[in-house]
């Protein structure tokens, strides 16, 4: 599966900053010190109802991670999956009377268009769950043969008790885990499971549903969590720098993934930092496909909204915060974009070297994009109030905002 085209990232003068970021597993902001190649895995979409503003906010956060790393002259190895077979996708295709493969392809193509418009840097590896199945099957067999998984009526479940570190990613108690498991695709009440929290690794073929050859597992399809583990281990290996996604992925998805990886490799954790973006609400409720209260990037683009303004609306909120999309949020972003563009359109302006360092410092401090925006606001206000004589300043600001914030002025 191919990703989307990359926009050029301008090189900036001076030195980039090492990133400090909030790690869900430890509950604190930790320093990250990647090697020459920083490694990041971000969980991708289930391709229906793409791309809503919650999606966009999540991928914006991890785009900033990449930009901070690139500014330190590191290379970035970024992997993202597409959950292109899953119960919600199949249910949506059946509801709409369309082929599930066609639906997935259409929505994935739309997602790529939205990511391109928003100038999100693409992954080097963009992997669909379906194409990963040949690599998933032997992992499930290994877990079963090692006693870390068991069969139940043809399905294969992972035993959470096989991982002594289970629970150390989300830090939730058993009651909270059970509740979230039921809400987020698990089946804690299924009779016969060794532990209600045990997640499915391999679903035996069901009538009327797609299935694939599972060798000794029989025909079926993989569970959600093992898909990401297989893709991440194949392309990044253990101990990569960041695993990212929305805060609703901390449990069960990232917790279970870490357990699968530990049982397969004997190593923990799978990622050095588990980083989670906040939820975006509309009319007081979390924006979600199940509720249908969605604001789509593609709809805004069709309505003529500049994608740079959409990106500024996302950047105005700290990535870990929960926030609400409103008309006022977009109006503020449009006004900011106009102010910034007018400021950099002049032939000269106030010196900008200190501004570049302010943006770097803000982003290195747990991706504090609102502080970075405030710094640019101050420079733009000074430009409009008094101007300046530095002929290179507007260009420096444009390149810094492009390279570090992904906004083209």
Swiss-Prot record:
It comes from Streptomyces avermitilis (strain ATCC 31267 / DSM 46492 / JCM 5070 / NBRC 14893 / NCIMB 12804 / NRRL 8165 / MA-4680). Catalyzes the ATP-dependent condensation of GlcN-Ins and L-cysteine to form L-Cys-GlcN-Ins. Zn(2+) binds at residues 43, 228, 253. This is L-cysteine:1D-myo-inositol 2-amino-2-deoxy-alpha-D-glucopyranoside ligase. A motif ('ERGGDP' region) lies at residues 183-188. Its EC number is 6.3.1.13. InterPro entries: Cys-tRNA/MSH_ligase, Mycothiol_ligase_MshC, Rossmann-like_a/b/a_fold, tRNA-synt_1_cat_dom. Keywords: ATP-binding, Ligase, Metal-binding, Nucleotide-binding, Zinc. One of its GO terms (cellular component) is cytosol. CDD domains: CysRS_core. One of its GO terms (biological process) is mycothiol biosynthetic process. It catalyses: 1D-myo-inositol 2-amino-2-deoxy-alpha-D-glucopyranoside + L-cysteine + ATP = 1D-myo-inositol 2-(L-cysteinylamino)-2-deoxy-alpha-D-glucopyranoside + AMP + diphosphate + H(+). Belongs to the class-I aminoacyl-tRNA synthetase family. MshC subfamily. L-cysteinyl-5'-AMP binds at residues 43-46, 58, 81-83, 224, 246-248, 280.
């Amino acid at each position: 599966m191919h990703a989307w085209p990359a926009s050029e990232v301008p090189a900036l003068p001076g030195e980039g900053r090492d990133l400090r970021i909030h790690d869900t597993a430890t509950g604190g902001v930790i320093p990250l010190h990647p090697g020459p190649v920083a490694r990041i895995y971000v969980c991708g979409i289930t391709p229906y109802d793409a791309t809503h503003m919650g999606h966009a906010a999540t991928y914006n956060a991890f785009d900033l991670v990449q930009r901070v790393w690139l500014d330190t002259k590191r290379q970035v190895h970024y992997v993202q999956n597409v959950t292109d077979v899953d119960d919600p996708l199949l249910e949506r295709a059946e509801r709409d009377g369309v082929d599930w493969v066609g639906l997935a392809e259409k929505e994935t193509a739309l997602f790529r268009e939205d990511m391109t418009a928003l100038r999100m840097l693409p992954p080097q590896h963009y992997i669909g769950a379906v194409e990963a199945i040949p690599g998933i099957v032997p992992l499930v067999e290994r877990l079963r043969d090692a006693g870390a998984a068991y069969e139940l009526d043809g399905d294969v479940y992972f035993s959470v008790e096989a991982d002594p570190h289970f629970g150390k990613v989300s830090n939730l108690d058993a009651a909270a885990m059970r509740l979230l498991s039921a809400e987020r695709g698990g089946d804690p009440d299924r009779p016969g499971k060794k532990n209600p929290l045990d997640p499915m690794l391999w679903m035996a073929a069901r009538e009327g549903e797609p299935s694939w050859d599972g060798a000794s597992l029989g025909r079926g399809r993989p569970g959600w969590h093992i898909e990401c583990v297989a893709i991440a281990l194949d392309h990044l290996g253990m101990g990569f720098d960041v695993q990212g996604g929305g805060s609703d992925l901390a449990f069960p998805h990232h917790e279970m993934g870490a357990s699968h990886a530990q049982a397969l490799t004997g190593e923990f954790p799978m990622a050095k930092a588990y980083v989670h973006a906040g939820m975006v609400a509309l009319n007081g409720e979390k924006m979600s496909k199940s509720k249908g209260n969605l604001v789509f990037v593609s709809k805004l683009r069709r309505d003529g909204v500049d994608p740079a303004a959409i990106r500024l609306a996302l950047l105005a909120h700290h990535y870990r915060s929960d926030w609400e999309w409103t008309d006022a949020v977009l109006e503020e972003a449009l006004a900011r974009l106009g102010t910034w563009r007018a400021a950099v359109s002049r032939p000269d302006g106030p010196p900008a070297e200190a501004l570049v360092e302010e943006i770097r410092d803000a982003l290195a401090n747990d991706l504090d994009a609102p502080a970075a925006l405030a710094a640019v606001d101050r420079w733009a206000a000074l430009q409009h109030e008094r101007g300046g004589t530095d002929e290179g300043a507007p260009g420096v600001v444009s390149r810094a905002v492009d390279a570090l914030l992904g906004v083209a002025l």
